[in-house]
C-alpha cells in the first residue's frame, strides 16, 4: 500500500478522529519494549537533535510498572541511547505515545481526521443542490453527523441558468 495515500484517504472518512500509524510490540517485557521503542525512534528521527516527551497508558493494569514509571524509565532509556535528544515536557518536537494492552502500541504521529459520526449511522437525507455554496456546505455538515446523503439538482430553464448547472456538475 501507498502509506501516504492511505493516510490521506482515511483523513476524509467521517467518524475517524485521529489516525495513528503504530509499531506493534507483541512481547510486553521491558527489555523488548525498550528495544522496539529505541529502534522506532532511530528509524523515524535518526541521529538528528530533537526534543521529546513520553506519554504512556496502561489498559492492562496487570503490567508491573505504572504509567508514570513507564514514561520516566523510557525517557531515561531514550536519553541514554540518543545523546542528541533532550526532554521538553511543555513543547516537545516528538510526543512518543506508548499504549500497553494485550500488546503494546508505539506511535508518535497522529493525523487528524474529520471526526463526526460514521456515515449511515443517523439515517438518510436528500440534499437539494442549488448551485450556490450554502447547499454543499450544509451537505458536508449533515454528513459529518452520520447522515447518508443523496444529492439532487433540478435544472428548470429559464428559471435556472446553464452556469448553475455547471457549478453542480
Please identify what each model-predicted range represents.
Residues 130:
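Phosphate/diphosphate-binding glycine-rich loops and adjacent basic-rich segments that engage nucleotide
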Residues 1-126, 140-167:
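RNA-binding accessory domains that recognize and position tRNA/RNA substrates
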Residues 134-139:
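Short glycine/serine/threonine-rich phosphate/pyrophosphate-binding segments
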Amino acid at each position: 500500500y501507498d502509506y501516504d495515500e492511505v493516510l490521506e484517504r482515511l483523513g476524509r472518512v467521517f467518524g475517524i478522529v485521529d489516525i495513528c500509524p503504530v509499531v506493534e510490540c507483541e512481547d510486553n517485557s521491558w527489555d523488548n519494549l525498550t528495544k522496539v521503542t529505541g529502534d522506532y525512534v532511530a528509524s523515524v528521527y535518526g541521529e538528528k537533535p530533537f526534543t521529546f516527551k513520553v506519554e504512556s497508558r496502561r489498559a492492562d493494569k496487570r503490567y508491573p510498572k505504572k504509567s508514570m514509571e513507564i514514561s520516566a524509565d523510557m525517557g531515561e532509556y531514550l536519553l541514554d541511547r540518543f545523546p542528541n535528544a533532550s526532554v521538553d515536557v511543555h513543547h516537545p518536537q516528538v510526543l512518543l505515545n506508548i499504549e500497553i494492552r494485550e500488546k503494546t502500541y508505539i506511535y508518535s504521529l497522529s493525523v487528524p481526521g474529520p471526526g463526526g459520526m460514521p456515515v449511515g449511522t443517523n439515517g438518510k437525507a436528500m440534499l437539494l443542490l442549488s448551485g450556490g455554496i450554502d447547499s454543499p456546505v450544509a451537505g458536508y455538515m449533515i454528513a459529518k453527523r452520520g447522515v447518508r446523503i443523496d444529492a439532487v439538482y433540478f435544472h428548470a430553464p429559464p428559471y435556472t441558468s446553464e452556469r448553475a448547472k455547471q457549478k453542480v456538475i
